[in-house]
From Swiss-Prot:
Reported function: Catalyzes the attachment of serine to tRNA(Ser). Is also able to aminoacylate tRNA(Sec) with serine, to form the misacylated tRNA L-seryl-tRNA(Sec), which will be further converted into selenocysteinyl-tRNA(Sec).
Residues that, per the record, bind ATP: R267, S268, E269, E354, I355, S356, S357
Source organism per UniProt: Psychrobacter arcticus (strain DSM 17307 / VKM B-2377 / 273-4)
Gene: serS
Record bears the keyword S-adenosyl-L-methionine: no
Official protein name in the record: Serine--tRNA ligase
Family annotation (Pfam families): Seryl_tRNA_N, tRNA-synt_2b
Amino acid sequence: MIDPKLLRGDLTDLQQQLATRGYTLDMAFWQSIENERKSLQVQTEELQSRRNAGAKQVGALKKSGEDTSELLADMQSVSGEIKTAEDELRTLQERINQAALQIPNIPAADVPVGASEDDNVEVRKWGTPREFDFEIKDHAHIGETLGMLDFEAAAKLTGSRFNVLKGQLAQMHRALIQFMLNTHTIKYGYTETYVPYIVNSESLKGTGQLPKFEGDLFKLINHTNNDDMDFYLIPTAEVPMTNLVRGERLDIKELPLKFTAHTPCFRSEAGSHGRDTRGLIRQHQFEKVEMVNIATAEQSDELLEAMTGQAEFILQQLNLPYRTVKLCTGDMGFAAQKTYDIEVWLPSQDTYREISSCSNCGDFQARRMGTRVKDGKQTSLVHTLNGSGLAVGRTLLAVMENYQNADGSITIPEVLRPFMGGADSIL
């Protein structure tokens, strides 16, 4: 949630900043509701002043032995008016809060202005795409030919946008997870966490998925009595890991906190009809190793650069060519104030595709979660950051395509061989 103070003054600058994100701020609504809030606030304070003045008068009358019945009756009436005004103010404030939850984060000053991914800015490239002397196959063809990637079985078990991995391909999938977690914990000092794959609505509200993006989530239903449950499958480990500090007051000496976790992720992929229907790129269920940092405002910019570098290091160790882009205002996620996407080279598509997204959310999520840091007598909102380190299925398909051989086999990257019993190829 953005700072509510920004919605109480001149809205022109805020409207212009949000417009770069494709969000139209309803200035008439916010000006009207703010005037209503001010009026109720003044009314409440005036009534409270009358009550306080009346209490003093009652004391003075009692001291002089005079009759207080009329004044007490008036004060009782005032107390009733105060309760009504306070109730109205609370109801109005709840309306304001619910409306504010729909507003995206404000872009950082150095985020390029743009409408779509076409306006993202390339920051750097690493590695040179391999030159093949045979016909390039896509990962779906490679996996199916090996008999280790089975979309038909997944469709029978569940439906479209699911997969079944078998044999050495399933082993490589597991090896990637172990390699990523070892890198983040041993090399970069993250605390590995095991978190629930089911969270409540407060957790999703804290990180920004609710209330605006409920259609992207899988919600659980109690079929015993057909009642809705306050439970959802996680769309990313960012949700449970970030919410570990929800409602907490942290000591500044504790920060930054660095968490990592491997989890499945579940997404409805609403709005993705017809896109990436073949293969592993866009699935309802996929695995990801996630990084989360909880930091001070002074630490967060530097930590975003570090986190992005940590995700890049995984690709470098796998010798997978990639590029890093800074997202423009119109392509950033709802909660982010600045984001880098890392895109890996896919030979079959002759292009780079997203494999990681690393974001600094500033105090946007912290304000929703009520998470603060204490520095002496002063407290302030923490900053939260998250990043994929990496999306496992997309890393697997990138390895399959970049390490494919003419005979249909896949060479296993050297860093993964210790996790695969020393094997050097998938046949």
